[in-house]
A protein has these predicted regions:
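Glycine-rich/acidic phosphate-handling loop/turn and adjacent ATP-lid/helix
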Residues: 166-197
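Conserved catalytic submotifs in the C-terminal HATPase_c
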Residues: 113-126, 163
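Conserved DHp (HisKA) dimerization/phosphotransfer helix of two-component histidine kinases, i.e.
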Residues: 49-113
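Conserved signal-transmission helix
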Residues: 1-11, 224-226
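Glycine-rich ATP-binding loops of the HATPase_c
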Residues: 201-218
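Conserved ATP-binding N-box helix of the HATPase_c
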Residues: 14-25, 131-154, 194-202
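A conserved short beta-strand within the histidine kinase catalytic ATPase domain
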Residues: 154-161
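Histidine phosphotransfer helical core of two-component systems
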Residues: 4, 25-67, 87, 125, ...
């Protein structure tokens, strides 16, 4: 078994725990809102009219949380299916967008905003034949590298750009950041950077720091050889 495959279970556990925690929050809000409605209704028929606005607000909250819950379960289902094939043809932009949705809770805990950036050039989508789960792991590891140096209120933009004629994923940190040399040193000395290097190597790719714009640049082959 490849050394990166050993870490896939831990990665799956971390992401799944994050999404199920979000689902627990959804259910807690629905329970609280429905409980309030039940309390009002149990007072008397007249109370329903008196507190109609509160009931209406509770119904809106419940509807919003149901939609949020459906979205979360869709994400989890799609994530689970990323293991269907060892090697698969994937749309890189779609994978970036998938990762950003999966990582929202982790960013929120750091008080950091995650955003995807549309491809710099329109045209055919960028596709790779690679290990889908490990690609998600590499993208997530790059975010964790950024989290180590970012302050609350920062922003991470992830998108595809051309780099030396090849497609590359640029993970750009913005906000109250250390100076360029300190940014590079702090990330390169972190455990997350070592993990990112290992995962990138398993994917026959590379991860480099671009200090000119506080950025991590990820490059992967169009088709993995093994």
């Amino acid at each position: 078994m490849d050394k990166c495959q050993d870490k896939e279970v831990a990665f799956f556990g971390k992401i799944t725990a994050g999404i199920t925690h979000e689902l627990k929050n959804v259910l807690a809000i629905i329970r609280e809102s429905s409980g309030l409605m039940g309390d009002i209704i149990s007072i008397s028929p007249e109370a329903v009219i008196k507190y109609q606005e509160k009931i209406q607000n509770s119904m809106v909250r419940i509807k919003d949380q149901i939609e949020r819950g459906v979205n979360l379960t869709d994400r989890l289902n799609k994530f689970a299916h990323s293991t269907d094939e060892t090697l698969s043809k994937i749309d890189l932009q779609e994978t970036i967008e998938q990762l950003v949705t999966l990582a929202q809770r982790f960013a929120r805990l750091k008080h950091v905003v995650l955003k995807t950036v549309p491809p710099s050039q329109e045209g055919q989508p960028v596709t790779l034949v690679t290990r889908h789960v490990q690609l998600l792991m590499a993208l997530f590891a790059s975010l964790e590298c950024c989290f180590t140096v970012m302050s609350a209120g920062g922003e991470i933009n992830i998108g595809i750009r051309k780099n030396k004629g090849k497609n590359a994923v640029h993970v750009v940190c913005k906000g109250d950041l250390p100076g360029q040399s300190e940014f590079v040193r702090n990330i390169s000395e972190s455990e997350n950077w070592a993990a990112l290097q290992e995962i990138s190597a398993c994917l026959e790719g590379s991860a480099n720091l671009d200090e000119t714009e506080h950025c991590i640049v990820l490059m992967f082959p169009e088709k993995i050889s093994r």
